[in-house]
């Protein structure tokens, strides 16, 4: 499975694509929420050019 690498509040993070719940576009950034485990939801964003193709595919599916 693919992973998404991003920075959130100055901290480098990496999350598996399978844990991502919701994806949306904000300008040239792709924002998302993901399951952190223990009932917590995390969020992150990555630039469109750095986003893995699986994340972009999820975005297209949610538009429909």
From Swiss-Prot:
GO-annotated molecular function: DNA binding; RNA endonuclease activity
Keyword terms, alphabetized: Cytoplasm, DNA-binding, Methylation
Listed GO CC annotations: cytoplasm
Signal sequence bounds: none
InterPro entries referenced in this protein's UniProt entry, alphabetically: Chromo-like_dom_sf, DNA-bd_7a-e_arc
SUPFAM superfamilies according to UniProt: Chromo domain-like
Descriptive protein name: DNA-binding protein 7d
Organism: Saccharolobus solfataricus (strain ATCC 35092 / DSM 1617 / JCM 11322 / P2) (Sulfolobus solfataricus)
């Amino acid at each position: 499975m693919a992973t998404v690498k991003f920075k959130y509040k100055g901290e480098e993070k990496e999350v598996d694509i399978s844990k991502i719940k919701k994806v949306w576009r904000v300008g040239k950034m792709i924002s998302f929420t993901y399951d952190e485990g223990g009932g917590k939801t995390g969020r992150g964003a990555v630039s469109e050019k750095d986003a893995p193709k699986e994340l972009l595919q999820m975005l297209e599916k949610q538009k429909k």
